[in-house]
């Protein structure tokens, strides 16, 4: 029963034209078919196909027993940021300061946060296609304009210098590069 004093939930106007993520819709349909007993190979959103390694479980258990159960700093703990800095130095030959590192719960969240913090209405984001289904929606929700550039098999699904140059305008604010690419695997 609804309370007449409480208005019904209403989506924000900026979300009115946003559709359900295609990948989530495909995953839901695949799960429905599996429940009906149909054999389905799910090529939707990826989930690990291996159990959490024992040393990770043990480290999480030790941390919980040590009382590390409260919120951490939004950009990551100093220890985590130091480990990330060291990883980039050791494996990639890149030098960053800890204040240049932000650790989040997922790639899409940090991308959305960056767009929300930096895009104004009309700013453009170049997105090579094919691309992960939510990139253009994130740009749109944050007030930007997704500018897609088709990257076909002939270029190894990579944006070419000529394509990039043609896509850049005075309104360009970002170039979205995902390596290796999801869904093509191009690096």
Predicted regions and their residues:
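Short acidic capping loops at alpha-helix termini that bridge into adjacent secondary structure
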Residues: 95-101, 121-124, 171
């Amino acid at each position: 029963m609804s309370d007449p004093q409480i208005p019904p939930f209403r989506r924000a106007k900026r979300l009115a034209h946003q559709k359900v993520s295609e990948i989530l819709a495909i995953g839901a349909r695949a799960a429905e078919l599996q429940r009906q007993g149909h054999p389905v190979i799910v090529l939707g959103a990826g989930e690990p196909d291996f159990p959490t390694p024992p040393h990770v479980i043990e480290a999480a258990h030790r941390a919980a027993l040590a009382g590390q159960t409260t919120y951490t700093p939004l950009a990551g703990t100093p220890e985590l940021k130091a480990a990330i800095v060291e990883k980039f130095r050791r494996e990639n030959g890149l030098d960053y300061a800890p204040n240049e590192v932000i650790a989040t719960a997922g790639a899409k969240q940090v991308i959305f946060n960056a767009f929300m913090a930096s895009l104004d209405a009309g700013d453009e984001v170049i997105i090579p296609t094919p691309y992960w289904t939510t990139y253009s929606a994130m740009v749109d929700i944050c007030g930007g304009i997704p500018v897609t550039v088709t990257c076909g098999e002939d270029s190894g699904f990579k944006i070419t210098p000529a394509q990039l140059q043609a896509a850049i305008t005075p309104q360009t604010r970002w170039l979205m590069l995902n390596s290796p690419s999801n869904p093509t695997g191009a690096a």
